[in-house]
Amino acid sequence: MKKLLAFAVAMTLLLSGCASKPAAAEKTPEELTTLYAQAITDNGGEMVEYNPVISEAKEEDGSAFLLEMMGLKAEDMAAFGISASMMNVQAYGIAAVKPAEGKEEAVKEGLQSFIDMQKMNFEFYLADQYEVASSARLETLEDGTVLMVMAQDQDSVFESISKAILEG
């Protein structure tokens, strides 16, 4: 009887150890907004100092215009963090966006239109900035975040921001 009881306890412990771990809780839009702003600020490079991250659209401070310039609509996004230059002297923009339900393609199309516009703006103007715009990265991360990086050294900036978001 003792052996049977010990065996039952051992099997229970063994099987409970094999159970899958619960998935990490989904972050709220507010938590994602904070995460995106911090990831871009910490890893976005020098240009973030001159172009602070915005995370809400307001008419009075130009952030609504910046969203429009980036091809984004507030209703297409559940959360976002964006740093971009409103002056057309450098090809620069970083956007981390959690699309609203069913809006991933709209977000990606908007950001791709921003990339295309920047390429066109710099094609005959500043060759080095045209190269930056042409090398922009736009991808959807494992957690559903759409990340666009157009900046000097975009690959390392993209990887750093991506890592910060996925580990956040």
Name every feature range the model reports, one short phrase each.
Residues 1-4, 8:
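Positively charged n-region of N-terminal signal peptides that target proteins for export
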Residues 91-101:
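A short acidic-to-branched-hydrophobic micro-motif
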Residues 13-17:
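C-terminal motif of bacterial Sec signal peptides marking the signal peptidase cleavage site
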Residues 33-37, 94, 104, 108-112, ...:
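Extracytoplasmic/secreted envelope proteins and their assembly/folding machinery
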Residues 86, 96, 129-168:
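A short, solvent-exposed beta-edge/loop patch
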Residues 53-90, 106-107:
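Short, compositionally biased low-complexity segments enriched in polar/charged residues
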